[in-house]
């Protein structure tokens, strides 16, 4: 499986990427929303893992633009935002899953 991780926090990105690669996944990492959108629109992925708070283009807008372009890659939001409203917004914008970070 090929995954896209869009995460600006380098420590979180390294932790997630290392774990996924050890599990046998191929992972591409984008450090901001614009780079993530470019990759999502030009490369095939089995899953996109997207943070909400990103530089250049926020995660919700990225997801909206991906869906507007008829890209059906499943999207998992991985975010420090934990409120019910944040989760509902994410699902309404086109994400398939929402995982709140703790720590």
Question: Residues of each region from the PLM?
Answer:
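N-terminal/domain-start alpha-helical segments
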Residues: 1-103
């Amino acid at each position: 499986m090929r995954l896209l991780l869009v995460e600006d926090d380098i420590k979180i990105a390294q932790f997630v990427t290392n774990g996924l690669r050890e599990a046998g996944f191929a992972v591409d990492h984008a450090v901001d929303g614009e780079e993530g959108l470019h990759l999502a629109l030009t490369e095939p992925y089995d899953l996109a893992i997207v943070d909400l708070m990103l530089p250049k283009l926020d995660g919700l807008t990225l997801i909206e633009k991906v869906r507007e372009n008829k890209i059906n890659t499943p999207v998992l939001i991985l975010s420090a935002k934990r409120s019910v409203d944040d989760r509902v917004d994410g699902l309404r914008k086109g994400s398939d899953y929402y995982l709140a970070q703790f720590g």
